[in-house]
A protein has these predicted regions:
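A contiguous, low-structure linker/loop signature
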Residues: 1-10, 33
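Active-site loop segments of alpha/beta catalytic cores
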Residues: 15-237
């Protein structure tokens, strides 16, 4: 933590130069009609990894982590600044849209959501809007607080996890475009079941600005053929 608080912007950027070089290489390889998305973790999620040094376990002691409120606010403020800078650099390298992952938003205590989740993400959202950079935000695990997040942060697009009812999402976000939601576990089912569930999603979001995607990452045990089937089903709809 001390090392992070002492690091300066130029050293931070130098450390991440391989990321920007990789984006530039990819940009030069893809077709002109293909959009390149860059990403970063949200301040709260990065803070969780910094203090826990790994993915939080079921017995993760959130109260212990939140003891030093002054330190947390100090770290979040610096993370906000560095994340904005990192996203800008990725856009300069060739990316066209930014996605911000708040993968551990779901473990923020309810009385801390405003300060630790909504406001840090709002700062990033406002910064990107000022630079005319489109954004997608993914506050995983917020459940029905997703609506409050969307109303406060007002991203260009909001990504939903698999616990969110798609019908509820369509009615709740004041026409903000929606991405994701499809359960990765569904890809472990038969092709006919996958087809049925994909069609259900596509019908729910018909005539709505929707980007089909999973509600989280592909599970390691997923058969690649099922992914190809998923893509074909979407394209044939």
């Amino acid at each position: 933590i001390d090392k992070f608080l002492e690091i300066e912007e130029d050293k931070f950027i130098k450390k991440l130069e391989p990321v920007y070089k990789a984006i530039n290489k990819v940009k030069n390889k893809i077709k002109k009609n293909q959009t390149l998305i860059c990403f970063a973790g949200a301040p709260w999620t990065l803070l969780v990894y910094m203090l826990n040094k790994k993915s939080p376990a079921k017995n993760f002691n959130i109260d212990k982590m939140l003891k030093d409120e002054f330190l947390i606010n100090l770290i979040l403020k610096k993370l906000d600044s560095f994340i904005c800078l990192h996203l800008e650099k990725q856009i300069q390298a060739g990316a066209e849209i930014c996605q911000v992952f708040d993968s551990w938003a779901g473990i923020v205590p309810k009385n801390k959501l405003y300060n630790y989740c909504y406001i840090p993400n709002l700062k990033i959202s406002n910064h990107l809007k000022a630079k005319k950079i489109p954004s997608i935000f993914f506050p995983k695990g917020l459940k029905y607080n997703y609506k409050t997040f969307a109303n406060i942060v007002r991203p260009n697009c909001i990504s939903i996890d698999s616990t969110i009812n798609p019908t509820w999402a369509r009615k709740s976000f004041n026409n903000i475009p929606i991405q994701g939601g499809f359960n990765p576990k569904s890809l472990l089912k038969s092709k006919s079941e996958i087809t049925r569930e994909v069609i259900k999603y596509l019908k729910t979001f018909k005539n709505y600005n929707y980007i089909f995607n999973l509600g989280h990452g592909v599970l390691p045990s997923t058969n690649p053929d099922k992914i190809l089937h998923l893509i074909k089903t979407i394209r044939d709809f």
